[in-house]
Structures are given as C-alpha cells and as structure tokens.
UniProtKB/Swiss-Prot annotation:
It is an enzyme of class 2 (transferase). Belongs to the TNF receptor-associated factor family. A subfamily. The keyword Zinc-finger applies. Residues 351-496 form the MATH domain. InterPro entries: MATH/TRAF_dom, TNF_rcpt-assoc_TRAF_met, TRAF-like, TRAF1-6_MATH_dom, TRAF2_MATH, TRAF2_RING-HC, TRAF2_Znf, TRAF_BIRC3-bd. This is TNF receptor-associated factor 2. Has very low E3 ubiquitin ligase activity in the absence of sphingosine-1-phosphate. E3 ubiquitin ligase activity is strongly activated by cytoplasmic sphingosine-1-phosphate. A zinc finger (RING-type) spans 34-73. The keyword Repeat applies. The coiled coil domain mediates homo- and hetero-oligomerization. The MATH/TRAF domain binds to receptor cytoplasmic domains. CDD domains: MATH_TRAF2, RING-HC_TRAF2.
Amino acid sequence: MAAASVTPPGSLELLQPGFSKTLLGTKLEAKYLCSACRNVLRRPFQAQCGHRYCSFCLASILSSGPQNCAACVHEGIYEEGISILESSSAFPDNAARREVESLPAVCPSDGCTWKGTLKEYESCHEGRCPLMLTECPACKGLVRLGEKERHLEHECPERSLSCRHCRAPCCGADVKAHHEVCPKFPLTCDGCGKKKIPREKFQDHVKTCGKCRVPCRFHAIGCLETVEGEKQQEHEVQWLREHLAMLLSSVLEAKPLLGDQSHAGSELLQRCESLEKKTATFENIVCVLNREVERVAMTAEACSRQHRLDQDKIEALSSKVQQLERSIGLKDLAMADLEQKVLEMEASTYDGVFIWKISDFARKRQEAVAGRIPAIFSPAFYTSRYGYKMCLRIYLNGDGTGRGTHLSLFFVVMKGPNDALLRWPFNQKVTLMLLDQNNREHVIDAFRPDVTSSSFQRPVNDMNIASGCPLFCPVSKMEAKNSYVRDDAIFIKAIVDLTGL
C-alpha cells in the first residue's frame, strides 16, 4: 500500500524582491536563485514541488490564488497535485536562507569598497550606501545618496526658491529669467549713476532725471538727436532752424493727403448711409431668425426631455434583464448540480460491490502519459444505504514506483452523511480487480486496512489520502492481451468485505 500525498502547513511574509546577482563576490550557484525573479533568494520559501521562491515573489504569484509551478512546467517535470503553488503548502526554507545570508557580498555602487556577507549587506548597508544612485524627487535626475541633501538645497534646477527682491516663488532654473521682469530688481541710471532703483520706479526716475538722455521732442518729424533732459530747451534753441525746416517739409507732404482725405470723407459718408440701410434690413432678418431659433430650442428641449425619459426606461429594463440573467445563471448552476447528483446516484451502489467502466481508454491514457490528467476518480459507492462512502482513484500511467510501467489503483474513504453512526477506523478487507472481459484471468489484489494510517480514520475533509496498489497491473500485460481493453474500455471492480458490519 502507498499513500498519495501529504500537504504540510505554510505561511508567507511580504518583503522585497530578490537580491541583485551583482552583489555576490563569488560565482553564483543556480540553487540560490529564485524560480520566479531569477535573482538571489531573499527570505526563501520552498513549495511542495521543491522549487524555491523569494517570499515577495511567492506572495505576488499567489495574490490571485493557487497557481501551477511555472518552473516545473518549464523543466518538463510537472506533476499533478504536487506542482501546485499555494500558501498552505509552502514553508520557510531556513536552511537555504542561512546559506544565502552567509554568501560573500560586495556593494554594486561604483567606487564603494564595502565588503561583507549578504546578511550584513541587508541589515547594515542596503539603502544606506552614500555612493548609491537615487532619483531626485524634484528634477528626476540621478544623484548619489550622500550628495542628495546638498543637491536639493543648492544644485537642483527644480528646487523651490523665492526671489530675494520681490519674494515671488520660482524654481532654480527660472531665477535669471525672473530677474529680467522682476518689478523690484535694482537698476542703475546711466545718466546720473544712481543705483538700486527698482525696475517699477525706473521710468519715473528717467522722466525726472536731468542727466538721462532722451529723444528730441521733434523726433516724430525727423530729428534723430538724443539729449540730456536738462539740456532739451538748449537743444531746441540751437536747432530751431532745422526743426522749422523739418516741420515745413512735413506740412508740405501732408497737404495733398488732406485733399484726398476730403474726397475720401464724402465717399465714406455715402458708404455709411448704404450700410445703415443694409443694417436695417439685416435687423429684420435677425428678428425672424431669433423667433425661429426660439422655436427650434423649444423643440430641442422637448426632444431632450423625451430622450431622458427613454434613457431612464432603457436603464430600468437593462437592470431587469441583468437580474433575470443572474437568476437564470443561478438556476443553471442549481440544475447542473442536480444533474451531477442524479448521475452520481445512478452510478452508486449500496452493497460494497462496485464495477467501474472507464470508456475512451486510449485517449485518457494518452492524457495521463502527457501529464495533463494523470489521475481519474470514480463515482462514489457505499457498503450499505447508510454505510461507509468510498471511491476509487486510478492512474492510467502509474504513480510513485509504478509511474510509466504500471496501472496504479487506489481506494479512497470519503466523508459520508452517516459517518457519526459508523465504527472507525475503517477496517474492512478491500479487493481490487481489473476484469478480463473473457472472464478468465482477472488481475486481483486485496489488502486489509492499516488502522493506524490516516487514510482509514474518520474523514475530516471530503476524502482521505488514497491508499492502494501503485504496482497494480503492468502496462505491458494489458497491451499483450486484448481481453482487458475491449471497445476502448476497461472494467475495474471493487469488493468491500461486509463481515462485521
């Protein structure tokens, strides 16, 4: 007899992903790598299939429920019931943890000479190395951890500052541009040499400062001279003849334009009168259009109200349809459950004798060989109407010592409705048979339960651990004689001795 599987308890703790492989100062062995992130294991956990994972990686994988072990699938060693990742069966691998933490490590930061063990790196140096590159939260640039504070205070172009002249907030990169427009920025008068004149008062100073050079008042008619404010009158006296000549020239140039403007004025009056007539016509048209717009707006509002009512009705009907779909879905589930129970009741027997026909044998065996469906459970059967509930479990490509060479057949004690009235542990002789369909050479094996085994105690879960015959029938024997497999089907018979019940 052989037990199928046992699931040890486990727990998970959330930490960080694995250590970078650049940390190790020696050649890295594959057994120290996480099967998920492929980095050095951090707080290793071992799954029931034997693969190791970082605590963080395993928790991430199991966040959506139990999963198939990707490493088993990749290595081609997937095993049904074993290659499953679940929190209840994973456990902390303290031996691997001690090995990993004792590995020699070096700091990966350029220029850092720190050396020690991986455990010392995690507890004393990780995240604290002054030469480690970190991201500046302001400018998003990379700076060394030891220089981060100085960078944030004096060098970061995105650091927050305030103008020392007007106290306006700005970032470091915009200080110079702000000084070009700052109203309090100090300026120096080129005329009188006065310093620290706020920009907002500089133009007032220029108007009153006698030393500032300003354009001549006749610059509009051609004088290009600039003179100090206090010498403006002296300049006008000295340049009186030139200014009069410039003024005369401007007047002579403007005279013909004035005549043209007079003629243009009469044309403009005529155009204005024409435009007034057109405007009156357009006003009448606009009044008509306004009334039409109001009518269309009222129609649109009525349509909008009707649309909202229709939308509310559609939403109400949609909600009812969803409720009906949910109700139909629940009824479908209930119907499927009832159909399954009816099928189980039709297949069940109540005298301790059960014959199980396995159809599509070739296809099911091929699926077992491929590892897709290695085991099949039979319908339940009973020793009596109120007796023990049992089923069979068969591995068409073998299990354990019989894998690949034998047909493995197991007996399973299931949780039944009348277990409280029965005698435990289960102690009835069990006979298992592969029937020769010519009724000559049946393959028979029998055993009496080991009452100390958990397989035969009163079930706590839906079914106990399977127990039976991993070497029940050689595959070669079945293939050599075609009377065991006929019409692509085999028959398994189980007989439970009812003596003493």
